[in-house]
A protein has these predicted regions:
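Active-site-proximal beta-alpha loop/turn segments in soluble metabolic enzymes
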Residues: 53-64, 88-104, 133-148
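Acidic, glycine-rich active-site loops and adjacent beta-strand->loop/helix elements
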Residues: 24-30, 39, 60, 205, ...
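Glycine-rich, aromatic-flanked loop segments that form ligand/cofactor-binding clefts
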Residues: 21, 25-40, 121-134
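Histidine-centered active-site/metal-ligand motif
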Residues: 2, 44, 255
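Catalytic core of soluble alpha/beta enzymes
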Residues: 84, 105-317
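Single conserved hydrophobic/aromatic residue that forms the stacking wall/gate
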Residues: 1-13
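Mobile "lid/hinge" segments at catalytic clefts and subdomain interfaces of large enzymes
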Residues: 29-92
């Protein structure tokens, strides 16, 4: 797919003589809501945190640049907070920190403190999201979730998530809160939480229109994670985006681990109008290049560019 993307970009430049985001999206464009992975756990880290990613997202912003600057401030403040707590601050593959914490509550407390120390209000200026990647701690033999020293049923896992949501109301989005094969758990959680948080489907749908159609019919999730090189073609990727929007699902364009410096997803996130973008922390060159591209696009669009706002202003057209 990366080769197809490069060919498409070359054709766009040669034939249309316009930026890729305009070629893909026309004139109805919107700068994306970005989600930045800043603390790693699960398979991405060797620590006591079973939830895989903790992200921050700019809620209050006057421009894309303004929101990104807020994220950078919180990121650097988090580094200092972790150092003061006695944790090492080496960077993982996606630019996030992997402190040797005991559990997810510690990670959320560190983020909460960092947002405040950076001069912002949790839940008003900066929100938190997480990729639970529940398949990592789901035990197929007993059908339960082995999470940070606890063995939990579907309902007990929901109660655990409720505890986090009550303690940290700035937690606004959860990706893959249940195992990809635990349809009953995911559907039940969606029914009780869809009006409270964004529930993002990744492993559950794999950017596959057929799997998304099944999830919609079952009532699972309210947002789709879109990975460009997961389904195999740009056409199928765009079909998954269209189906999501048609059925009221938010869309989050995502990087992959082992990401390259290719910036196509930045153009696509703008082109699909009102999408969200998950592409790592504001660190490491392959991540920063995508944010630099978004800043370039904002400059090209000029003053008055439209901004996607989360969670209250998502365009499903």
């Amino acid at each position: 797919l990366h080769k197809a993307i490069r060919r498409q970009r070359q054709m766009c430049i040669r034939d249309s003589r316009q930026p890729l985001y305009r070629y893909l999206g026309g004139i109805d464009l919107e700068m994306p809501q970005t989600f930045h992975n800043v603390i790693n756990g699960g398979e991405h880290a060797d620590n006591g945190i079973d939830i895989q990613e903790f992200m921050i997202t700019p809620i209050a912003k006057t421009s894309f640049r303004d929101g990104f600057e807020k994220i950078v401030n919180v990121y650097h403040t988090l580094k200092k907070v972790l150092e003061d707590m006695g944790y090492e601050t080496g960077l993982g593959d996606e630019g996030g920190f992997a402190p040797n914490m005991k559990n997810s509550e510690e990670a959320l407390k560190a983020l909460h403190e960092s947002i405040i120390k950076a001069g912002y209000k949790p839940g008003e200026d900066i929100g938190i999201a997480c990729d639970c990647a529940a398949s990592y701690f789901y035990n197929k033999e007993d059908g339960k979730y082995h999470l940070e020293g606890k063995v939990l049923t579907d309902d007990e896992l929901a109660a655990y998530y409720d505890k986090l949501l009550d303690e940290f109301p700035e937690l606004m989005s959860m990706e893959d809160p249940y195992d990809e094969n635990d349809v009953e758990g995911m559907v039940k959680f969606t029914a009780t939480h869809k009006d409270r948080i964004q529930i993002v489907l990744d492993d559950f749908i794999c950017t596959n229109p057929a799997l998304l159609k099944k999830a919609i019919k079952e009532g699972a999730g309210n947002a789709s994670l879109i990975k460009l090189n997961q389904i195999g073609t740009v056409t199928e990727t765009l079909e998954t985006i269209r189906m999501s929007r048609k059925n009221g699902y938010n869309t989050m364009i995502s990087h992959r681990s082992g990401e390259t410096g290719d910036t196509f997803i930045a153009d696509l996130a703008v082109a699909i109008n009102g999408g969200q973008l998950k592409t790592g922390a504001p660190a490491r060159s392959e991540r920063v290049e995508k944010y630099n591209r978004l800043l370039e696009i904002e400059e090209e669009l000029g003053k008055g560019e439209r901004l996607a706002f989360f969670p209250d202003d998502v365009d499903h057209d």
